[in-house]
């Protein structure tokens, strides 16, 4: 986290890939409020097992989010991927239970 804080002090956009955040328990999301140049990327590929659907999201300052929405392509997410992501969110507890089991096995 210290490295990200140092980078976020620069006059540049800083993008952090948190694809494995659910497995590590570490996130820089709390830094976004202080550093509006910080963008965090998350995916449903790992914790929810949706790798083939290529769906994820970003977390950023509202101004950055507005800019990204203005330039995104229409229909950039398939209906199937969107439905699967919504189901993963609704049943997040099930997915996170699996993550916790994997983490316990890793630490064993």
Give short role names for the model-derived ranges.
Residues 1-14, 18-47:
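Active-site pre-lysine segment of PLP-dependent enzymes
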Residues 37-108:
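PLP-dependent aminotransferase class I/II
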